[in-house]
Amino acid sequence: MKLVLIRHGQSEWNKLNLFTGWHDVDLSEEGVVEAMTAGKRIKEAGLEFDVAFTSVLTRAIKTLNYVLEESDQMWVPVHKSWRLNERHYGALQGLNKQETAEKYGADQVQKWRRSYDTLPPLLEENDERQAKNDRRYQLLDTHAIPSGENLKVTLERVIPYWMDTIAPEIKAGRRVVIAAHGNSLRALVKFLEGISDDEIMELEIPTGVPLVYELNDDLKPVNKYYLDK
């Protein structure tokens, strides 16, 4: 059984080196090229899908659309869930990463970005950036909507979705592709590979490059490789 993971192509805020999180930004021109290239590589590798999953953020949705178009699989059913969103960067969203490091210190910013259980500064309740003000989240329990997340909290929303929704599709023999985000995918990879809290700090997933897992019957990885050529 194979599972394909794809981090969205470069976004406009990736290009500007800004903390993005749940803020909904589009792909950059380079990101579009990355997504299209990913689709072409998937087609060349002969990978076919029966069902696709993505977040409710434009950059991941568009990446998946380009991948399916370039691999001639636009008809594949797509399921969107906020549980596959990027981690919520709280009050850091919209800030420049370099300027934030200069203000708070590089070590502190590195902890906010890469530590498993260090929370970023949270959004204030009345902050206009609160996701509860976004129509796509209006059906959610307000208690489920974060004001900021670390990787641990992100994992706690990603893995139940994996267990309840995605894994049963794979076990039923359906071929799955997931287009999501750096940290929601890091959370899933941590779970699949049993990566420690410390080791996960070093894991970086490149934008727009398909990551292929070969899984056993227990959905444990027996092999993995990037389609980067």
Swiss-Prot record:
InterPro entries: His_Pase_superF_clade-1 (IPR013078), His_PPase_superfam (IPR029033), PG/BPGM_mutase_AS (IPR001345), Phosphogly_mut1 (IPR005952). The active site is at 8 (tele-phosphohistidine intermediate), 86 (proton donor/acceptor). Coiled coil: none annotated. Transmembrane segments: none annotated. PROSITE patterns: PG_MUTASE. Its EC number is 5.4.2.11. Catalyzes the interconversion of 2-phosphoglycerate and 3-phosphoglycerate. This is 2,3-bisphosphoglycerate-dependent phosphoglycerate mutase. It comes from Listeria innocua serovar 6a (strain ATCC BAA-680 / CLIP 11262).
